[in-house]
Amino acid sequence: MTSQLFAVFRREISVERAGREALVTTVPFVAALVVLAGLAFGPSPRDLAVTGPGTAWLAVLVATIPLSRTVAGTEVAEDSWDALRGLVAPGALFFGKLLAVWSGLALTWLLAGGLVVVLFGVPVPPQSLYGGAVGTLALAALTTGFGVLTASGARRRGLLAALLLPAGLPALLAGTQLASAKVPVLPWAVLVTLYAAVVLVAAWAVFPALLEE
């Protein structure tokens, strides 16, 4: 299973390098959202300091929508999705896709957070790194599951925003609080950890059924 997992992950990275679909759709969107938010909330440094962490996490949450379309979109377009899910074990396919999406969301979080630090002048507390790692993992599990669920039909893809955004709210809230100054760390760290564990286990458990859709 491990060899299949990393084979799927390497394939995802190779596909992204060749097409740069996620890069082209995500980076300009995140940059535009952060810049526009800075213009809307500014120019008061106090207002920017309050809204900065939430802006970064909102960008990450909304970025799950275009990223979810890349989970199985290439295989469906090439008519290779049926062959892939027939040859690769469901667990290996899930975790290989998950690692690829997690990498994309982690880079998105780093980009959004870096822009917020530069443009908003918001410091980075140490606990925000934990929130970023665990929160993006939870969102990656959601994105992988919903990406596979909606890959087989155009009508289903229209439901992505309605499914992903509400389901990702705990990561948005906990990540924002962990990136904010003078906020109790432990309750939010526990929340994002439990949320990530529940989402990861649930997505893994239902993934074989999603492959049959």
Segments and roles (model prediction):
Residues A141-G147, L169-S180:
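Transmembrane alpha-helical segments of integral membrane proteins
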Residues E16, I65-L84, E213:
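Transmembrane helix boundary and interhelical loop/hinge segments in multi-pass membrane proteins
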Residues R20-G42, T55-T64, L163-A174, L194-A202:
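Hydrophobic alpha-helical transmembrane segments of multi-pass membrane transport/permease proteins
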Residues M1-T26:
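Aromatic- and glycine-rich beta-strand/loop motifs that create alpha-glucan
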Residues L129-L165, L211-E213:
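A structural motif at transmembrane helix-loop-helix junctions in multipass membrane proteins
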